[in-house]
UniProtKB/Swiss-Prot annotation:
<dbReference type="GO" id="GO:0003899">
    <property type="term" value="F:DNA-directed RNA polymerase activity"/>
</dbReference>
<keyword id="KW-0548">Nucleotidyltransferase</keyword>
<comment type="function">
    <text>DNA-dependent RNA polymerase catalyzes the transcription of DNA into RNA using the four ribonucleoside triphosphates as substrates.</text>
</comment>
<protein>
    <recommendedName>
        <fullName>DNA-directed RNA polymerase subunit I</fullName>
        <ecNumber>2.7.7.6</ecNumber>
    </recommendedName>
</protein>
<keyword id="KW-0240">DNA-directed RNA polymerase</keyword>
<keyword id="KW-0804">Transcription</keyword>
<keyword id="KW-0808">Transferase</keyword>
<dbReference type="GO" id="GO:0000428">
    <property type="term" value="C:DNA-directed RNA polymerase complex"/>
</dbReference>
Length: 109
């Protein structure tokens, strides 16, 4: 691991957890622990998030640390297709509440 940048080591650790841990609860706890160790370093967290964008690992990190969905990632670059993919997944899901919000601009109950 010599010569590895700190963000690369974090991504490597996160990948190891994701591939080795059997249960989602364990994965979430372990991922949360790693992110919490670096929570005060916004630049590093953003670099990690950019490095894992569009992967299952990205979704796992955001599930483990929902606070990263807000202000911290506002500067992370999102491609236009990301938005369309989210909308497409929502529209093809069975979640009628989300569909109503998207189509009719209704607020959830």
């Amino acid at each position: 691991m010599k010569g590895m940048d700190e963000y690369e080591k974090i991504i490597n650790d996160l990948n190891t957890i994701n591939s080795k841990a059997k249960f989602i609860g364990i994965k979430i706890i372990m991922v949360r622990r790693i992110i919490d160790m670096h929570k005060d370093n916004d630049k590093l967290i953003k670099k990690v998030l950019e490095g894992i964008k569009n992967t299952d690992l990205y979704d796992l990190v955001l599930n483990a640390c929902p606070e990263l969905k807000g202000e911290r990632i506002k500067d992370v670059y999102f491609k236009k297709n990301d938005y369309f993919n989210v909308i497409k997944k929502t529209m093809s899901s069975e979640n009628t509440v989300l569909k109503n919000v998207l189509i009719n601009d209704e607020s959830p109950p």
